[in-house]
């Protein structure tokens, strides 16, 4: 028997109901914040992610589904959504139009990594990208939007924030960090020793406990910010505090992608296993220019749908729609016509098989229909339909035309 590949799964009800509910809820809130839906390809040039995510990142170095296609092009399945959104933004010349552009998207991403709780090789993200505003108020609004999404979904979380500085203050910090890392190099894991040479900031993000212990006295980014970055970060904290939004400062929060600058944030939950981030993002003011576009400030985030599915409780749904059934085969044509007419405004379930009234009532209850409508021998003779409201338990017969 052929089975789904490791780390990839099918989604059936009731899981699929939660899946759709999460996307619908996040989409509705994003639209309220002025975001418009976009769709980008699953397949992109590998160079896009090497340039944006960074060749030294784990995603590019270890995790991409990468291959040469029949045309000889080096392509890969997208491992994340921001790079494709930025590529689309530039390709469609939106960087030349000026103004503010806000987009949201959702869909599958692919990373070849070890499957574990809340982490699959094919996983789904909901993301938002805002282009054109270099403002701490936009940073705050993005965090507020994610908060609204999780509050609506009934998910508990902790907000963590950090600043990654800018081209003015990051070089000096990186130099002092490298000096410190070289001093403790022998106590670091192999990955961190490699990152010390290729991408020292990522060492701070290592999950190995021994490395974290060695990093206790490492230089702190927010203590090395330039005047502008320091002012913005303090303003962000002030906004969060004034709106009674609790947060934690996390000097080790650097995110896993190379394109982030200034504000970085994560929403974390202790209920999703070792990989406890359920949403994350930050500012990437240089990425549009780096990928060939006109310099454009930007900020974005993504939340992992599989990560939060177990945390979401669906609201209790009322019965909905009409179940149509027959007790005589001659009535099938009539219920097909009724179903076609009713589907203009109602959800309709049709059972084509001849069944007893008791069997139809059980089936209507099973699909959650509000009404069970059945045509039997007597109803057929009198051009009527038997109708039961499964919520109020009221029963009656009505004319087919009237119904």
Range-by-range predicted roles:
Residues 1-402:
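TRNA-recognition modules of translation machinery and tRNA-sensing kinases, especially anticodon-binding
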């Amino acid at each position: 028997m052929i089975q789904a590949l490791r780390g990839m799964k099918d989604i059936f009800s009731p899981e699929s109901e939660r899946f759709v509910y999460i996307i619908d809820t996040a989409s509705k809130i994003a639209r309220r914040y002025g975001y418009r839906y976009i769709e980008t390809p699953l397949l992109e040039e590998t160079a896009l992610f090497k340039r944006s995510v960074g060749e030294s990142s784990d995603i590019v170095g270890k995790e991409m589904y990468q291959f040469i296609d029949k045309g000889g092009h080096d392509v890969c399945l997208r491992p994340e959504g921001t790079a494709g959104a930025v590529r689309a933004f530039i390709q469609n010349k939106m960087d030349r139009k000026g103004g503010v552009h806000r987009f949201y998207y959702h869909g599958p991403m692919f990373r070849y990594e070890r499957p574990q709780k809340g982490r699959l090789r094919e996983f789904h993200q909901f993301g938002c990208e805002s282009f054109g505003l270099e403002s701490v108020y936009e940073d705050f609004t993005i965090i507020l939007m994610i908060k609204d999404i999780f509050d609506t979904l009934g998910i508990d979380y902790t907000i963590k924030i950090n600043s990654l500085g800018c081209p003015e203050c990051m070089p000096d910090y990186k130099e002092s960090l490298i000096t410190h890392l070289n001093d403790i190099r022998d106590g670091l894991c192999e990955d961190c020793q490699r990152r010390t040479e290729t991408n020292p900031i990522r060492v701070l993000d290592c999950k190995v406990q021994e490395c974290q212990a060695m990093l206790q006295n490492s230089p702190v980014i927010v203590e090395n910010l330039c005047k502008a970055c320091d002012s913005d970060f303090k303003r962000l904290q002030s906004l969060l505090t004034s709106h009674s939004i609790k947060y934690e400062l996390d000097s080790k929060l650097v995110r896993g992608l190379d394109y982030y600058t200034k504000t970085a944030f994560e929403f974390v939950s202790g209920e999703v296993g070792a990989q406890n981030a359920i949403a994350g993002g930050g500012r990437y003011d240089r990425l549009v220019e780096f990928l060939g576009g006109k310099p454009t400030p930007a900020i974005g985030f993504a939340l992992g749908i599989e990560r939060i599915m177990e945390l979401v409780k669906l609201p209790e749904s009322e019965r909905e729609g009409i179940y149509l059934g027959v007790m005589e085969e001659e009535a099938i044509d009539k219920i097909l016509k009724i179903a076609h007419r009713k589907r203009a405004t109602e959800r309709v379930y049709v059972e084509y098989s001849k069944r007893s009234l008791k069997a139809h009532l059980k089936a209507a209850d099973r699909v959650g229909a509000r009404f069970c409508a059945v045509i039997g021998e007597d109803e057929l003779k009198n051009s009527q339909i038997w109708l039961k409201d499964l919520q109020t338990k009221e029963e009656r017969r009505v004319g087919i035309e009237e119904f």
